[in-house]
Amino acid sequence: MKKKLLLIFIIASFSVFSEQIVNLPESNIKSDYIEINKMKNTKNVIVLEKKDIQEKGYKDLSAILDDIPSINVGKSGWGDIDIRGQGEGSSAKNLQVLVDGAPITTLVNHPLQTNYNIVPVENIERIEVIPGGGSIIYGSGTAGGVINITTNLKRLSKLINSAEISIGTKGEKYSLAFGHKLTDKITLQLSYLRDNKDLYFKDTYRNSDYFTAGLNYKINDNQNLSLRYSKLFEKGQFVRTINYQKFMKEKKNYVPEDRKVTVGLDKDGHKIEEIISGYANADRKFESINLSYNLNPTKNTKYLVDAFYNKGNFSNTNLGNQVMYHHTYGFKNKFDIEYAKSTSFEGSSLLLGFDLYKQDAKLEYNDYKTLNYKKKTYVINPLSFKYNKKTMAFYLLNTLRYANFESSQGIRRDYTYWGFDKKAAKNKGNEVSHRHNTNYELSLGYNYSDTGKIYARYERGFTSPDGLEITDDFSKYDIKATRGEDEIYDLYEIGWREYLGFSTVNLTAFYSKTDNEMSRNYILDPDLGFGRKTINILKTKRKGIELSLSQKLGKLELKESYAYLKGKREYNGREGEFVNPGSYIDWSNSGLQKVPKHSLTLEATYQFTPRFSSSIRYSYSGKYSNFSNIKDKEEEGFISSYSITDLSLNYHHENGITIYGGINNLFDKLYFEYVGSRMYTVVPADGRTFYMGIKYKF
């Protein structure tokens, strides 16, 4: 089926060759961020504009990203975003997520996980995805890539006044935005959104309130100051995973059994127990404040500083009152210098940067230690897991232009101080691990015509341990920082961009390798029993192709995107120091675990009239292996491919009213966002859903 659809798109493109109207390629779209503008000429940057994501039935950021072929959301773990086939166990830490340039990447993903659905779809102006790399600007965790979400608060010079209501089979939304010019130099933007989501299973939901406020002060023609505030408050309950057999029997009517939890001890030391719902708690809070200052001291220089502060908490568990609190604050400085004016190197520039920020997270709850087994008496054993990570970095990115050539050379020095204060059930410890790394980048691009470009780039980056790996060195009484090294990756990328008469083409091929990948291996401690220890005994290679095409053929617009991802993991020669030969893994050659080899998205939009249009989108996700060890192949097997078709309609009236609607998963396909080991547990995706809405801009 997928081959036929792709063939239809290609034939249609050639058959109307004479009706060519070519779209701007993504590389020519100016970013709101100076660093991305410098990177995108010799790097594949995927850009999704507001018009690409709004009024199309996307329920959240995860749904938007999952339609990008090189990204998989939820396959490698609940809430995980996997870019360029990192696979299970690696995707969460090989990722950087930013909102308006400020980092919100989760510091620790154990034992509680979360997702990145912080900003509602209605408040997103643009999403920029940098697949693989970006380490000169963003530092650790960019092996998979970077996602930068630009909200309506970033563009305070463009005021928004609107009201919107949307309803559907999965809930309803109400939003209001108000912008006003207070003076010739000061503008104010406010917005509020209420989102009531009905989830897959009976009595499951996520209801949220999202408020934003922004103030922009244009000091003069060369200076600008903006202050932005946002707050998300979310409540709900949901089912994290469900047994596959139970799901096939009960489907959407499944209700998890109530759970008995201990909430304290009485005066005699006996447990006080309560019965709570078996649903996972979806409560979450997220609050952020951002301050940006831009200064143009001269015609050839720019200074930009972004200060940020955010805090919040989440649970996403059915284990009781366990809550993870997190907090990030700091600033990013950028100083850009254009040089070589009126010379052969005109257009060259040097970007200098200094980053300083700190992230912390904590989880605290009570455990109950047996005092007398026969009398069933206990004592409270408070557990505490506190993490903090301080990052200080200096970098420079030089962009050199000469005739039709463009080259970038970058270097970044990172100083990371990874600390923890941890009290577990049987041991404790606190320590700070000092980790220093240097990243490099070198690229060369050549504009061989007015419409065509080829480029090649090399990048060296690193990934530091996550919150769980950093404490993977313990004894009977102590917890110490891991002796595992930071992972080092080498990325090679070549690209081609062109207008082929009737179509834009953006083709990228990449190869990356990590020779010291971290692995959490089981160890047996005589007192603590089985545990894990982080050691660098693996090497992993990943390769892939990313292709995107677009055509404008009269009233018909076509878009095609495809990704091929393949990885291979094996031992690097150090396994003998740590692992018993009898425990060696016979690594599979069928690709990394939970990474589809082929992914495809096709979209057609037809403009019936200047005001009325309709779109149909087809998404295909290929099969993938659910195992790493060849001996598990028969038991774990492969997870089947699936395809989804979405339909949307949109009508714009001249008085500012937009009416839209559509059907997602048109053919009501049953598929799973996540499949656990041996397909024992699954997370089902939504079936067919309907939606419609009306928006008024005033």
Regions found by a protein language model. Give the residues of each.
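Conserved C-terminal beta-signal and adjacent last beta-strands/turns
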Residues: 179, 445, 456, 492-494, ...
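Gram-negative outer-membrane beta-barrel transporters
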Residues: 401-405, 416, 510-514, 533-630, ...
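Transmembrane beta-barrel wall of Gram-negative outer-membrane proteins
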Residues: 166-196, 201-240, 281-298, 335-337, ...
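Flexible loop and strand-edge segments within Gram-negative outer membrane beta-barrel domains
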Residues: 197, 224-290, 312-326
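Extracytoplasmic beta-strand/coil segments of soluble accessory domains associated
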Residues: 62-103
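Outer-membrane beta-barrel signature, preferentially recognizing the C-terminal barrel domain
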Residues: 258-288, 292-293, 382-390, 433-435, ...
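Surface-exposed extracellular loop regions of Gram-negative outer-membrane beta-barrel proteins
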Residues: 358-374, 415-422, 445-493, 504-505, ...
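Short acidic/polar hinge/loop motifs at secondary-structure boundaries
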Residues: 103-131
